Amino acid sequence: MKIGIVGLGLMGGSFALDIKIPYPNSVIYGLDMSKENLNKAIELGLIDHQLEYSKISEMDLVLVAVPVNYLLEILPKILDTVGQKTLVIYVGS
């Protein structure tokens, strides 16, 4: 399963860490506005690869874990490229 996580903060990072337990063969892709967060997530093994918007259509699941004030900015980009069978989930507070 290919999983894309948009937002690698507390919620997105925690999901990335825990999803490997029930789905050990999943491949996790991550996207974050902060290059530092992205590099740290790769370094810690939370994600396997960096996610590009152009690759979102290849994901089976996209988890959007960004603050609500960024949601209106990035959600159209995600929905414009998402595959027909891709599940998109927003987790935010």
What are these regions (language model features)?
Residues 1-53:
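NAD(P)+-binding Rossmann beta1-loop-alpha1 motif at the extreme N-terminus of oxidoreductases
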Residues 33, 66, 91-93:
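Short beta->alpha hinge that forms the Motif I/post-I loop of the SAM-binding pocket
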Residues 53-89:
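Rossmann-like NAD(P)-binding element
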